[in-house]
Amino acid sequence: MKSTAESKETPSQDESTTSVPCTEAPLVEEGEEASFGAYKRIFTFAGRTELILQAVAILAACASGAGIALQNLIFGQFVTVITDFTNGISTPADFRDNAAELALYFVYLGIARLVLSYTYNTLLTYAAYRIVRNIRHAYLKAALSQEVAYYDFGSGGSIAAQATSNGKLIQAGASDKIGLLFQGLAAFVTLSLSRLWCKWKLTLICICIPVATIGTTGVVAAVEAGHETRILQIHAQANSFAEGILAGVKAVHAFGMRDSLVRKFDEYLVEAHKVGKKISPLLGLLFSAEYTIIYLGYGLAFWQGIHMFGRGEIGTAGDIFTVLLSVVIASINLTLLAPYSIEFSRAASAAAQLFRLIDRESEINPYGKEGLEPERVLGDVELENVTFSYPTRPGITVLDNFSLKVPAGKVTALVGQSGSGKSTIVGLLERWYNPTSGAIRLDGNLISELNVGWLRRNVRLVQQEPVLFQGSVFDNIRYGLVGTPWENASREEQMERVQEAAKLAYAHEFISELTDGYDTLIGERGGLLSGGQKQRVAIARSVVSQPKVLLLDEATSALDPHAETIVQKALDKAAEGRTTIVIAHKLATIRKADNIVVMSKGHIVEQGTHESLIAKDGVYAGLVKIQNLAVNASAHDNVNEEGEGEDVALLEVTETAVTRYPTSIRGRMNSIKDRDDYENHKHMDMLAALAYLVRECPELKWAYLVVLLGCLGGCAMYPGQAILMSRVVEVFTLSGDAMLDKGDFYASMLIVLAAGCLICYLAVGYATNTIAQHLSHWFRRLILHDMLRQDIQFFDREENTTGALVSRIDSYPHAILELMGYNIALVVIAVLQVVTCGILAIAFSWKLGLVVVFGGIPPLVGAGMVRIRVDSRLDRQTSKKYGTSSSIASEAVNAIRTVSSLAIEETVLRRYTEELDHAVSSSVKPMAATMICFGLTQCIEYWFQALGFWYGCRLVSLGETSMYSFFVAFLSVFFAGQASAQLFQWSTSITKGINATNYIAWLHQLQPTVRETPENHDKGPGSGAPIAMDNVRFSYPLRPDAPILKGVNLKINKGQFIAFVGSSGCGKSTMIAMLERFYDPTTGSITIDASTLTDINPISYRNIVALVQQEPTLFQGTIRDNISLGVFNPNTQPFFSDKDAVKSVSDEQIESALRAANAWDFVSSLPQGIYTPAGSGGSQLSGGQRQRIAIARALIRDPKILLLDEATSALDTESEKIVQKALEGAARDGDRLTVAVAHRLSTIKDANVICVFFGGKIAEMGTHQELIVRGGLYRRMCEAQALD
């Protein structure tokens, strides 16, 4: 695979307004910066417990750092012991005894480091978990408190992903890294103070090293933090766009939008990549400057020390050696400043982004306690001279000086064209917005003076597009009890009220038939229920609290005629004694209203009762005539004597209690179900994961080569240092000019070593960021692309909610960025240093080298690998748990209108927090286990240094090795220990990166069932007709024991217009899903033009099909963008190409499609016309407007097969009439085959064949006239909808 991120140009401003899906609101407040202040503020979210844990941890870290400094004292004694033996002061036996005693101090020091390292790492990590939990809690609370207008700007689309991914960045920068930093600083300060007391002049020279290092690090980190902030902002916009794509995945599949949408998603990533490239020279400068300064300072200290010794200012060589060794140990700890500063700046940038929303004051805060809460509600509603424009379109007046009185206890109906302001009134009554001018009163009180939560609890709403939440049916209806006296009642009492409400909404019967009844889980957004079932549950949710004011915004639009009749009666009954405002396009549902208000362009055209308006013969009467259905006996005159059409056969309905598939079929269904389960996937180990990442982008081979060469050069640092320090000891055996000359030479060698570090680390820092940014870009794009490749059943799985998927899109590529950035280079350098130091030790003293290398390094590596394995398992578990919390946040934010109308912000926040608490509490034990392994990696180095010191001195005393060889070997062991200790400090980044790689690799190889293959590549759908279904049975893959279709036989001829009608949940929309190949039949077959559908190339097939869904899906971008996505271009390029067929669609084609969908007038009236942003999910448009745009998108495709799933359900009567004529014309256009699902029977009465579904089968078939005469189910449906 090749990435073209490098070659893509950023779209111009003009292009971005027409083709780039943009977030309409700025994501960053003016002047906002990620600074040290933002980092400090992270810790203000720590409670008393967290502060105590952190204080104890920092004390332990400082003690651990002081323990590091104690090494120097032991080494000072070590030099004394060596000197005494060399000078003959002590005997070989005394020498061995003294060495053994000193070796024990190393053992004790290692034990202390084990305890202290375990303590501070465990406490800091746990405290960070809790602090991040508090920040996430505050962030979602702030998000849920924002007024709806905030989300209209598209500002909240990626809130769930930000909470998860930014939380992980904060976690990384506010946990164990703090302990390591304090440990390093404590070591440096302790060493400096101890040496300052003894040799203050030389020590003061050495202090220039940290001053220069810290100064350089601070400046570079500050600049780098600004770039990190900008990248996070761009990624937040990209996540928002991706969230919209994944939420509308069925539309993406149906229209083959994947490559076009991924290409638009990539435009954000290209911009982020450009900013990311600017970090490369900064990291090169940061790492190279750090190591160069350290070795230059080291050389200066050695040079000055030699000359001070020559002048007699320093008494013994041991004093110089001790100071130099202090510099070395302190410098090793200072080298951690650079990588940690990057972690801290990323945490600050991530926190600053979250704090911006946390600090934002909502104009309408649902958490506020202020406002009136009257004890009694009558229900008098009055709108007085209300004028309103949406904040996103202030130039368009939606309501113009509008006045209306809604008497208490009466039913008032609002009708009119889409966009006339009907739903706007609902939004104002719910206080989603405040009017521009005028007043709205409830029982004489201005609603702006009422408590927001109290108002929404007493004014209940059923929306046009009902939104349900993950959980059970009971959970969803119970949300309506929040804030009422029954909220804390027993489950039995709540269940009683829930069932009463369900019966009222005609939902009890179908709920009782579900697998687990009221405890049945319904999936994300209620996806496992049909549209009509969802709407009935939503009605039950709104009436369960017995509100005094009820708002019904197309509350029965998704119900079948029979259910609609019964539910309407129930609503009529529910309306008794309460104020009800009904918005309806189905006029049959409002004919009994006390007052019907006909609206147009924000004004009232006429109002009155059904009878008075009919008598007036005005606008309303004309609408009634359009919707009227003929059900009289004269229809019999047009019926064939046989009672059947030429291709129509009446099927006998036979009910079967449970469908039992053969064992082989059930086995296949279960294998398909398990195939999408990531937990069953075999995971790659670290080396395999790294190899996969390297192979994935071969275009980075030169960058990898630079990193390899840089690492090879960098690994020479410790061996070179060991040799030079050993030579330093020899220098002190000389005197006079010879000593000074040798001293000057070795000081210059240290400068050469510094120059080598400058070159190597500059290359490593620059190249690793280049690789990391490229891989992050590539995998963000690839993971979205691979998700969109999957079958619909992949998105049906509980773990694959939209929020969880977006979280993975954001967090997994970032984990790879951390793994393949400087972290992996430091790990490689540390590994090479351990190897080279080990080889050096063996080369100079093979006995000592073999004993120490094979006695110390294997247990250290073993402990580190065990930590990585445990850490990896912990990361997978926490990611899964945070995925659940992310799903809760995502569905709440995306359904903010439903959440606010139910006033369940606190309930949602409590659910979210409970998931966070569960994630934190379940992480304690595995975290404690992994920290034991970390403690071992920090202490084992002391134990094999003790072994090396004891055994080396023994060899020296026995004359088996020279003093110089011993020094080289021992210092090599010492530096190998230092390198190995650093090796596993990055294990958290390693494990996260490995887990991310495993998921991405699994997803990439996961092949959908419905896909193009070499076998079907050339197999097209032919003419697209006839379509034949032979004994089709179907169960959803995740519910194999709940059959939906139970043996459907049907033939649809070329040019026919066929309609599916029936009760909600009877299988109509499932038939549409089968014809779109969202799913394949469990048994039976579907043939297209005599070819089995499963044998046809799905891309070729879908290219001749267009779908209009019941709940239209629009994407971020302009109206033009959304319609253009419907165009099929046979030359569409793969997603990594620069070419985009969508941009080639002409404005004339767009206009033609809009006119056909009766949408041109309203679109052309907008200030930006077809270039008007649709908003996230089409939020800038009304429901009817969204549906017309979706119809235009389907018609511009010029399909051979047109699938209409309640295509006109959200349209007003006039628009429906015009659009219906357009759709009928489209259906009659040539040989086009049209399949329509409809509850509004007036839209399908002219169909060639009407199929009445019942119980998963076709109960009746025929024309409108034939079925009316037959007097069966269809006739009863028509009678229910007749208006005359």
Swiss-Prot record:
Its main location: membrane. It is found in: Cell membrane. Residues 381-626, 1027-1280 form the ABC transporter domain. The chain crosses the membrane at residues 55-75, 99-119, 178-198, 203-223, 282-302, 320-340, 705-725, 745-765, 824-844, 846-866, 931-951, 955-975. Residues 55-346, 705-992 form the ABC transmembrane type-1 domain. Keywords: ATP-binding, Cell membrane, Glycoprotein, Membrane, Nucleotide-binding, Repeat, Transmembrane, Transmembrane helix, Transport. The keyword Cell division does not apply. Residues 1-11 have a biased composition (Basic and acidic residues). SUPFAM superfamilies: ABC transporter transmembrane region (SSF90123), P-loop containing nucleoside triphosphate hydrolases (SSF52540). Pfam families: ABC_membrane (PF00664), ABC_tran (PF00005). It is a multi-pass membrane protein. GO terms for cellular component: mitochondrial inner membrane; plasma membrane. One of its GO terms (molecular function) is ATP binding. Glycans are attached at N385, N401, N488, N632, N800, N995, N1122. Induction: Expression is strongly increased in the presence of cycloheximide, imazalil, itraconazole, hygromycin, and 4-nitroquinoline oxide (4-NQO). GO terms for biological process: oligopeptide export from mitochondrion. ATP binds at residues 416-423, 1062-1069. PROSITE patterns: ABC_TM1F, ABC_TRANSPORTER_1, ABC_TRANSPORTER_2. Residues 1-24 are annotated as: Disordered. Belongs to the ABC transporter superfamily. ABCB family. Multidrug resistance exporter (TC 3.A.1.201) subfamily. PANTHER family: ATP-DEPENDENT PERMEASE MDL1, MITOCHONDRIAL (PTHR43394), ATP-DEPENDENT TRANSLOCASE ABCB1-LIKE (PTHR43394:SF27). Pleiotropic ABC efflux transporter involved in the protection of the cells against a wide range of toxic compounds. This is ABC multidrug transporter atrC. It comes from Emericella nidulans.
